[in-house]
Amino acid sequence: CDRRQRQMCIRDRSINERFTDSQTEKIGIRSLKIINKPDKDGKTFYVELNGQPVFAKGANYIPQDNFLPRVTEERYRKTILDAVNANMNMLRIWGGGIYENDLFYDLCDQYGILVWQDFMFACSLYPAEGEFLENIRQEAIDNIKRLRNHACIALWCGNNECNDAWFNWGWQRRYTQQ
């Protein structure tokens, strides 16, 4: 993964040409596509990074501790470096966990680890209307805005095991029996 990062500084000028505010952010610029096209076996599913096909090797990442404040910077660094040393280039943030803190994404940017970011909706059926749907929409907006400058974010995904539960785990049958 291309690890080049840039710093962008935005400054706000008042009418008298004095700077009134500024903000500096690290940003990563890259092109990433998920290639899904027909082939002899059905359909492809691979990552193309800056025009080059990439074999995604990685792991499913869950929260490191039930008590989140116990996860130290050293533990985050060790986790990401362990992934790098295992020749991984992608981690999937499990939708039953949490949106990780900024350090996690900063380290992934630094070490070239792509992130398959689940939205935090897993293993259940969720209402798809009204206030709950608006809450989901706002959660997506807030987290995409928060993480959008990280080059490590490869894709956003949702609905972890929700359809599987309905169609394959007997949820549909149990629901209709009630």
Language model: regions and residue ranges:
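Single conserved hydrophobic/aromatic residue that forms the stacking wall/gate
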Residues: 1-10
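Active-site-adjacent substrate/metal-binding segments within catalytic domains
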Residues: 7, 14-124, 130-155, 161-165
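Polar, glycine-rich mid-to-C-terminal structural blocks
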Residues: 167-178
